[in-house]
Regions:
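Structural motif
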Residues: 49-50, 68-71, 81, 141-142, ...
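Adenine-nucleotide phosphate-binding core of ATP-dependent small-molecule kinases
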Residues: 101-143, 147-186
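Short, acidic Gly/Pro/Ser/Thr-rich loop/turn segments
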Residues: 2-5, 78-81, 151
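Glycine-rich phosphate-binding loop plus the immediately following alpha-helix
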Residues: 30-58, 87-128, 181
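Short beta-strand segments
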Residues: 1, 52, 71-77, 145
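Glycine-rich phosphate-binding loop and adjoining helix at the ATP-binding site
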Residues: 3-62, 108, 155-176
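Solvent-exposed alpha-helices and their adjacent loops that cap or buttress functional pockets
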Residues: 43, 62-66, 71-74, 134-136
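Gly/Thr-rich phosphate-binding beta-strand-loop-beta motif of the actin/hexokinase/Hsp70
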Residues: 67-91
Length: 186
């Protein structure tokens, strides 16, 4: 979801009672919109907290701190984060961008589609997505992580370019620690 300075702007998966790909509950949508998650957690836990999305935490654990670095996480849907010079850039809810046949990236490359297509076809789809996004973002380095990154075939990875790196899902743990020193946009 989209979080700015610990405040929820949008969180599509928590606005439904039954999880992803189900109907949005207007009452939950209203309750989450503008919710200061970071402050609420700090008060409840009686300690400082930092609230980021999954791709931002993942990226905190892997970025080099040099240049324009993009992080994509593949799981239930698509996580997305941008870092420039080691600083976290404002969030883009790229997963909700339309991609094909009036569908979003979340749906087009998410877990449901991976299971439906099988890993080989899904992996080619990821390669096509990377090829299409390269001229838009012109990253110095693209990191692909998340639970489904392991499903990308080596043949497809080899065709993505040297600036594309698959990173382990465990990077999120290191990112959780490093997030405390991560510079953010103002």
């Amino acid at each position: 979801g989209m979080i700015r300075h610990g405040v929820v702007i949008s969180t599509p998966h928590y606005m439904t009672k039954s999880g992803p790909r189900t109907k949005i509950d207007p009452e939950l949508q209203e309750q989450w919109s503008g919710f200061d998650m970071q402050n609420a957690l700090s008060k409840k836990l009686e300690m400082p907290t930092r609230v980021l999305n999954d791709a931002e935490v993942h990226g905190a654990g892997i970025i080099s701190g040099s240049g324009y670095e993009v992080v994509i996480t593949l799981g239930t849907g698509l996580g997305f984060a941008i870092f420039y010079g080691g600083s976290l850039s404002p969030h883009i809810e790229f997963s909700h961008a339309p991609v094909r046949r009036a569908t979003t990236y979340d749906t087009w490359i998410g877990e449901h589609e991976r299971r439906r297509l099988g890993n080989a076809f899904w992996s080619r789809r990821i390669r096509a997505m990377v090829d299409e996004l390269r001229p838009v973002f012109m990253w110095d380095r693209l990191y692909i992580g998340g639970g489904n990154a392991r499903c990308i075939r080596q043949a497809d990875l080899d065709r993505m370019g040297d600036e594309v790196v698959i990173v382990p899902n465990a990077a999120g743990v290191a990112g959780g620690v490093r997030a405390w020193t991560l510079e953010q946009y103002k």
